[in-house]
Amino acid sequence: MAKKSKIAKLHHQEALVKKYAEKRKELKAKGDYIGLSKLPRNSSAVRLHNRDRYDGRPHAYMRKFGMSRIKFRELAHKGQIPGVRKASW
């Protein structure tokens, strides 16, 4: 599990991205790069790093499910992910 501070930082960053998304879009459309540079750096969506929504793990993230491979395997074995079955051929 990731440190609580890293998870809190991620939530804060996501809030900033959401807050400034519209303003950032307007400034980009106008081509006002000086105005863009005055916005907080963490308000850019590019700076977000995908993390497991359950335990905050930053590596081995599966975009389709929003979780790490470890949590995915754990929940899939319990049958808690709809539509996921163990492969057999």
From Swiss-Prot:
Annotated TM spans: none
Single GO MF annotation: rRNA binding
InterPro entries the record matches: Ribosomal_uS14, Ribosomal_uS14_bac/plastid, Ribosomal_uS14_sf
Keywords: Ribonucleoprotein, Ribosomal protein, RNA-binding, rRNA-binding
Tagged with keyword Amino-acid biosynthesis: no
GO biological process, one term: translation
Domain of life: Bacteria
GO CC term (a single one): small ribosomal subunit
Primary role: Binds 16S rRNA, required for the assembly of 30S particles and may also be responsible for determining the conformation of the 16S rRNA at the A site.
Family: Belongs to the universal ribosomal protein uS14 family.
Subunit organization: Part of the 30S ribosomal subunit. Contacts proteins S3 and S10.
Name by which UniProt lists this protein: Small ribosomal subunit protein uS14A
Species annotation: Limosilactobacillus reuteri (strain DSM 20016) (Lactobacillus reuteri)
